[in-house]
Structures are given as C-alpha cells and as structure tokens.
C-alpha cells in the first residue's frame, strides 16, 4: 500500500502517480528523497491527499480482483490537492478528478485543508470508485442513488 512516507512511487514515476491515480501538480521529495513532511510544509497536503486516494484505489482493486476503469474514460484519476479557497471537496467525472480546497476556520483562525484529511480524501475517492462501477447512479433523479453514493463514501473512509 502507498502512504505519505512512500518512496517507491517517486522512484517508479517522478510525476508522482500510480497506474490509476496521478497528482495534479508537482510534489518534490524531502531532503532524504522521501515524501514525508511536517504538517507545516505545504507539500504535506499533496502527499496526504494523493496517498489517501491511491490507497483507496489499490485496496479496492485488490478486493475486486480487477482494475478500475474510470467513468471519465481517462486512464488516471487526477488528485488536485488545493483547488482554491472553499470549505469543500468533490469528485467531478467530467474533469476526471478529485478536487480539494482550503479555507480559514472561523473559530481557530487556522487554515484548514480538506486534502489533509484521509477521511475526506478517501470519501471522495469512493465517489469516483462507485461511479466507475455504476456510472448511471450519478444521473439518477431518484434520491436513493445519491444517498448510496454518500454512504459508500463514508464506508470507504
């Protein structure tokens, strides 16, 4: 499995990707050549978001015994660790990716990054995973498929 401390990803592909997930943007290794950073380092968000999504995809493929074919018809799901200011994260089939954001916590005054949460990143990954298996669910007018999507995201996280 991949994790924030994974070094084999970079050694296999300097663009930080697996066969099914790629990072939208660059991520440079630390001085030791690893992808482990303190939370104060901006690279922490990219490493956390990418590794959480890559782990979810790898675990699902291992469980299913088959490769995921994305509903976007793209080879790889793109992880965009910081898409701007908002308290949000979402999966967008048309863009072929997962988009995470940041904003200021009104109570603490600290910046919060949705991509730093393994639970949020994995939840969004499972929207893409379920969409790969059952793409018709996203176009349903019934409320049940939407609720099922949210449940799968929560279960996966």
What are these regions (language model features)?
Residues 59, 128, 154-155:
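Transmembrane alpha-helical segments of multi-pass membrane transport proteins and ion-pumping complexes
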Residues 49-53, 118, 149-152:
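Hydrophobic (often cysteine-bearing) scaffold residues that line and stabilize catalytic clefts
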Residues 75-78, 115-118, 147-149:
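Alpha-helical scaffolds flanking conserved acidic
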Residues 83-84, 143-157:
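Post-HExxH zinc-binding segment in Zn-dependent metallohydrolases
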Residues 102-121, 140:
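Short pre-active-site segment immediately N-terminal to the catalytic Zn-binding motif
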Residues 78-99:
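Catalytic zinc-binding patch centered on the HExxH motif and its immediate surroundings
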Residues 1-62, 70-75, 131:
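Acidic/polar low-complexity interaction segments
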Residues 125-140:
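Catalytic Zn2+-binding segment of zinc metalloproteases
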């Amino acid at each position: 499995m991949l994790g924030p401390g994974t070094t084999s990803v970079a050694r296999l592909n300097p663009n930080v990707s697996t066969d099914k997930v790629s990072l939208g943007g660059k991520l440079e290794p630390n001085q030791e050549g690893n992808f482990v950073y303190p939370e104060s380092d901006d690279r922490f968000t990219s490493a956390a978001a990418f590794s959480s999504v890559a782990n979810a995809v790898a675990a699902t493929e291992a469980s299913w015994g088959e490769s995921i074919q994305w509903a976007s018809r793209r080879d790889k799901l793109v992880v965009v660790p910081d898409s701007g200011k908002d308290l949000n994260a979402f999966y967008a089939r048309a863009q072929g990716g997962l988009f995470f954001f940041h904003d200021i916590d009104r109570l603490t005054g600290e910046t919060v990054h949705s991509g730093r949460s393994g639970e949020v990143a994995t939840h969004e990954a499972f929207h893409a995973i379920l969409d790969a298996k059952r793409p018709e669910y996203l176009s349903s007018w019934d409320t049940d498929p939407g609720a099922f999507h949210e449940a799968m995201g929560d279960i996966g996280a």
